[in-house]
Structure formats: C-alpha cells, structure tokens
Amino acid sequence: MSERKRELAEEASSTSFSPLKKTKLNDSSDSSPDSHDVIVFAVSSSSVASSAALASDECSVTIGGEESDQSSSISSGCFTSESKEIAKNSSSFGVDLEDHQIETETETSTFITSNFRKETSPVSEGLGETTTEMESSSATKRKQPGVRKTPTAAEIEDLFSELESQDDKKKQFIEKYNFDIVNDEPLEGRYKWDRL
C-alpha cells in the first residue's frame, strides 16, 4: 500500500465522528496494478461518504441521505485530476465529510424514497458494490384474506328495519316541526320559519 493510502487510513482511524465504521474493500491483492484499495466511511448523520484512495484510475461513491433513511440519494463517479488535487491538498480530507465534498465530472444519481437496507455480498464487496433491497413493511401489515361471511336473514332484516325507522323519524320530524330536513326547506304548518 502506498504511503498516501496509509496516511488516509491513519487519518480516517483518528477521526472523532461518533459512530464511524471503516471497511477496506478488495483486500486480496495489493501488488496487482488493477487492484483498487477503497476505504469506506459510514457516518450516521445527514451525509455519508465513501472515498477511493487517490490512484489514477479509481472511482468514488458518495451516499447521502437522512438519518431516518426515509429518502436517500446514491451517486457515483470517477475522480478528475482536479478533484484529486483538491483532495491531496486538503488537510482534513476524510475527516470533515460535509465541508469538503468532492464534485465529479460524471455523476449518476438514483433517488429512493422508501425505507431500504444496504447489503453486500462477498462478491460485491470485492467489486466495491452495495445493493439496496426494499424493506417490506407492508408485508408485515398484510392481513390474511378472511372468509367472507354471508349475513343471515335476521341481520338483513335488522338492517332494513333500521333504515325504515330512520325514514319514520324523518317523517315524524317533518310533521312535528313542518321543516323538510332532506331538502332544507320550511313547510307550511304549525310553525313559521324565517331565514336568518
């Protein structure tokens, strides 16, 4: 591992963020020219970032979202020579993730507006990939389809008798107060209704 990569790893391990998780991906071969050492920082705040060690052809992944994981955006892209220079010159690279975020030339964004959980498989860890799977909160809330109960004749009769009694109550009100509550009109009779 190069000296700069060691410095980044030491600087990352000495940070003061409360829940900080450091994971090294693709650990299998340091001597291969195609291998990439990637250090991933996961901080539970409103901004989470992972940055690649500064090699000529490596890429970075930046993940930003809310603590509640209700919405999240995932973006990735390759470093440009300018952004590598900014990162090398910055004394707090990897320490203050919110103040020194690196802009990239190519960026792909995906917005997820549901609860999700990040999972990595051994193969995807080697490739530096993280997959997201939707948590099924609706699966736990699903009700088992019940057997439809056919109402008995007595229940049907009770329903219709209630409806008839409501009609009877309306008629009684109309006769007593000479006011049609259905059409909201005064009727001729015992009382005289004046509009206010």
UniProtKB/Swiss-Prot annotation:
The modification Phosphothreonine is found at T152. The keyword Nucleus applies. Keywords: Cell cycle, Nucleus, Phosphoprotein, Protein kinase inhibitor, Ubl conjugation. Coiled coil: none annotated. It is found in: Nucleus, Nucleoplasm. Expressed in newly formed organs such as the shoot apex. Expressed in cotyledon, primary root and marginal region of the leaves as well as in developing pollen. GO terms for biological process: negative regulation of cyclin-dependent protein serine/threonine kinase activity. This is Cyclin-dependent kinase inhibitor 6. It comes from Arabidopsis thaliana.
